[in-house]
């Protein structure tokens, strides 16, 4: 998935993705991955047994924190492609923050999605407009 994301957003990998399984402590169990790209990195942690109190939706079964850092340019179309890749995880809730690292660290956009309000694919298409 990470290799396809890098290709879709037209970034250049510096190495292959490194993926690790974390088993302890139990509440932190899941996959951790990082991939360096020419303009920074992509990292994520996928918790398979998170504390239920931190989940935002009653149907949520796991938690994914996905970070794409780049000093390059990402369009809404690029971000739409990344979000489509996350469809395989069956998202139920999303907090999205776009930070501009060009001159300083400023928030360009914050968005929240919940499956009770709108379908995932519909929200992605609306986001990309």
Model segments located where?
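Polybasic/polar functional segments that serve as interface/processing modules
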Residues: 1-129
């Amino acid at each position: 998935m990470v290799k396809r994301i890098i290709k879709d957003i037209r970034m250049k990998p510096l190495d292959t993705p490194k993926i690790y399984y974390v088993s302890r402590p139990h509440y932190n169990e899941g996959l951790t991955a990082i991939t360096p790209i020419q303009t920074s990195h992509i990292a994520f942690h996928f918790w398979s047994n998170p504390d239920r109190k931190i989940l935002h939706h009653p149907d949520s079964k796991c938690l994914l924190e996905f970070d794409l850092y780049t000093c390059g340019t990402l369009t809404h179309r690029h971000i739409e492609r990344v979000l489509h890749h996350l469809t395989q995880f069956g998202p139920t809730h999303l907090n999205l923050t776009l930070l501009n690292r060009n001159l300083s660290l400023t928030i360009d956009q914050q968005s929240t999605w919940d499956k009770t309000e709108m379908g995932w694919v519909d929200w992605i298409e609306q986001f990309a407009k």
